[in-house]
């Protein structure tokens, strides 16, 4: 049962200085109303927020691991000391608080919902693989709608609904954080136009697949998208093509198999600038959407894969310990989407029509 505090919150026409405009249904700019501005980090289990949720052990989508530890813990953070941009990053991969700290420093809200992402090692094992198998599962995992015969993920267990339920909980639990801004006027969903959908590797691939279906503020794909045998990348997109951004290391195996060049071009990202090596240029990187790095990872392709997000594999200044790609992350998540580079031709050496 929802708390009285929660019900009152949803009933109010404004939340902490966030007023609805009755003439057009849009909202004014988000402003924090926090008497003690600070950084907030919040956690909640999906199964405790929404009683409709269920585990799906057949795809290792469960509430607890083999040792009984909670597996459905969701993370969120916001820094009310920083002027808010009114954008919510939904992160589709393992929680990375260092990344969330960076996002919060840009004035972004960030959450990591618990959603189905371990099916990759279980499903779509036929060879040759169907060109729609993984893409359809990704979409069902994200939406909770029936797109695949391989899985059965209902609405309460899809990323969309779990994110919505989480933000509702955050709005009640942490009103100082202004989370209610991201709820629709009627309180029935998220304002997806203000959502930045993002992830790394497998998660970035699902993020891009979801953005084909649902219009979002932007997509940030770190070391992705992958799926070189799938065709969803060339489908019509609800999210405008100029809103897709990607960043990867040249030694990442995704380049060896043409995952990245293929996905980036099929998504239309070449229409907004060339591939730019961020180690040789400064922001705004020719306003492009396709960024790479070639910093020394001692030939380690696994480190290369994870090096494009904050963490131990990332490039740091040897003296100060500061991240060398901080400007890149800021660009990826905050660069104006309407500021675009000049279109370039497709790379004919990148194999787009791949078969097993």
Regions found by a protein language model. Give the residues of each.
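The feature captures the conserved acid-bearing segment of alpha/beta-hydrolase catalytic domains
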Residues: 217-309, 313-314
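Alpha/beta-hydrolase fold nucleophile elbow
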Residues: 185-199
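N-terminal cap/lid segment of alpha/beta-hydrolase-fold proteins
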Residues: 27-80
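Short beta-strand element of the alpha/beta-hydrolase
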Residues: 85-94
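Gly/Ala-rich beta-loop-alpha elbow adjacent to hydrolase catalytic centers
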Residues: 198-203, 207
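Bacterial N-terminal signal peptides
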Residues: 9-17
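Alpha/beta-hydrolase active-site loop
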Residues: 132-187
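Conserved alpha/beta-hydrolase
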Residues: 107-124
């Amino acid at each position: 049962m929802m708390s009285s505090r929660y019900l009152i919150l949803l009933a109010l026409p404004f939340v902490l200085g966030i007023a609805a405009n009755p003439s057009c249904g849009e909202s004014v700019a988000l402003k924090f109303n926090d008497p003690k501005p600070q950084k907030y980090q919040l956690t909640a289990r999906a199964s405790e927020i929404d009683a409709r949720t269920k585990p799906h052990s057949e795809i290792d989508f469960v509430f607890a691991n083999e040792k009984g530890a909670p597996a459905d813990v969701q993370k969120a953070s916001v820094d009310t000391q920083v002027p808010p941009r009114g954008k919510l990053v939904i992160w589709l991969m393992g929680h990375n608080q260092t990344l969330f700290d960076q996002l919060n420093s840009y004035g972004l809200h960030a959450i990591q919902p618990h959603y189905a992402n371990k099916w990759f090692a279980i499903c779509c094992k036929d060879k040759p693989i169907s060109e729609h198998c993984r893409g359809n599962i990704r979409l069902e995992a994200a939406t909770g709608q029936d797109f695949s015969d391989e899985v059965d993920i209902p609405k309460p267990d899809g990323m969309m609904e779990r994110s919505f339920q989480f933000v509702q909980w955050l709005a009640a639990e942490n009103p100082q954080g202004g989370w209610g801004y991201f709820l629709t006027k009627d309180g029935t969903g998220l304002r997806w136009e203000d959502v930045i959908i993002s992830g790394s590797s497998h998660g970035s691939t699902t993020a891009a697949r979801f953005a084909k279906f649902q219009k979002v503020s932007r997509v940030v794909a770190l070391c992705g998208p992958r799926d070189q045998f799938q065709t969803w990348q060339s489908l019509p997109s609800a999210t405008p093509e100029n809103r897709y951004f990607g960043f990867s290391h040249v030694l990442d195996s995704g380049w060896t198999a043409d995952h990245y060049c293929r996905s980036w071009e099929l998504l239309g990202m070449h229409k907004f600038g060339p591939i730019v090596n961020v180690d040789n240029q400064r922001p705004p990187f020719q306003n492009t959407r396709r960024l790479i790095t070639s910093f020394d990872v001692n030939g380690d392709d696994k480190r290369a894969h994870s090096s494009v997000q904050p963490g131990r594999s990332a490039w740091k200044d040897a003296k100060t310990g500061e991240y060398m790609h901080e400007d890149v992350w800021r660009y990826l998540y905050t660069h104006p989407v309407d500021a675009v580079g000049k279109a370039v031709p497709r790379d004919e050496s990148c194999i787009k029509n791949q078969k097993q």
